[in-house]
Design a protein with these regions (language model features):
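ER/Golgi luminal nucleotide-sugar-dependent glycosyltransferases, focusing on the catalytic module
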Residues: 1-120, 127-340
Length: 340
């Protein structure tokens, strides 16, 4: 396997959801729907371990861009040569600020000053869990990813989560289908669409969609995402109006999010086909916390996403938080260069 030589940056946004000033500003701009759902805005106090994992398991990273509304963790070492502190106003156009929508933060990432063409986007709940190499994210200058296809299934409505993220990803797919033909993409690079990186059901799904002009849907993989900055700029060039409409102060159910970049990379064959099967995504709950701790201890999965859940009560959350902190402290006991 040839070694990847391009510079690779990491980007991770973060907000101190327990900051009274942030909560006050949020409620000022949204008085009709103030913060009441703690499941959406809990601070588990484990973010420092994200950086310890990066130093231990991805020491090759070029730069780490920490994106916030201007408030940074008090323990962050601003003098760290690998760390770049980015405020929303440093790259997001003023007309979109202040913003409380992750979509606005994500859709403008190409404007982050100094960001490399090749970067990996993390949410602050996505942790590297074992040694990774540049080739886990990019090969031949292309993002490693698995274009596992599926037929679109209508999401079910939930009174708390409403329509969820699937409606937004439906919008992402619709935009991609406006600009690309599935038939043309497969003809251009058939091994991208029928290669050994696809497992049984996914390979069968690709066969079932043979000859279709439009893409149906791609399996949702909630983990860190390798991206090309040039693809983000291309989407802005092609769909400026819709991208601007998606950069709202608060998340809208009908809008685009960063998955449009992933789908665009697939449709334009700008990806390196990979299995990407060593990733885990688990909801944070009292019933799942021991499973999470086992994954952390075993270190078999290369990364793990710890999804917040609105169904986790405050009492349960305290128990989960204590157990998580114990597990992370045991796995990463030493401070990283990113900490004071």
């Amino acid at each position: 396997m040839e070694k990847e030589t391009c510079k690779i940056d990491f980007v991770v946004p973060w907000v101190d959801s327990s900051d009274p000033a942030w909560i006050e500003q949020y409620n000022h701009y949204r008085p009709e729907k103030p913060i009441t759902d703690r499941g959406r805005f809990r601070n588990w106090d484990i973010f420092r371990y994200w950086f310890r994992a990066v130093e231990q398991y991805a020491p090759w990273v070029n730069k780490v861009y920490l994106v916030t509304n201007g408030t940074f963790p008090e323990w962050v070492n601003a003098e760290c040569p690998k760390l770049v502190l980015v405020r929303h106003e440093d790259y997001i156009p003023e007309k979109f600020l202040p913003t409380f929508s992750s979509h606005t933060i994500e859709l403008n990432m190409d404007k982050i000053p100094g960001l490399s063409e090749h970067f990996v986007y993390f949410n602050d709940d996505m942790y590297i869990n074992a040694p990774v190499v540049p080739e886990d994210y990019f090969r031949n200058g292309l993002p490693c990813d698995c274009n596992a296809e599926t037929l679109y299934s209508c999401p079910w409505y939930d009174p708390i989560d409403r329509f969820g993220i699937k409606i937004i990803m439906f919008c992402d797919m619709a935009v991609v289908n406006r600009h690309f033909s599935r038939r043309a993409a497969v003809k251009q690079a058939p091994r991208q669409w029928f290669g050994p990186h696809l497992w049984g059901k996914s390979f069968l799904s690709s066969l079932m969609q043979t000859g279709l002009e439009s893409f149906e849907f791609f399996r949702w993989r909630h983990s860190e995402q390798p991206l090309l900055k040039s693809v983000i700029r291309e989407v802005w060039e092609k769909e400026a109006q819709l991208m601007e409409e998606s950069c709202a102060r608060f998340r809208k159910e009908v809008s685009l999010n960063q998955y449009v970049f992933r789908f665009w990379q697939f449709a334009s064959n700008r990806f390196y086909p990979s299995k990407m099967d060593s990733r885990a995504a688990i909801g944070l709950s009292l019933g799942n916390v021991e499973k999470i701790c086992r994954i952390l201890e075993e270190g078999k999965m290369k990364s793990i996403c710890l999804n917040d859940s609105p169904y986790c009560t405050d009492e349960e959350a305290l128990k989960v938080e204590r157990r998580l902190q114990e597990a992370f402290k045991k796995k990463f006991p030493l401070k990283s260069m990113f900490e004071k």
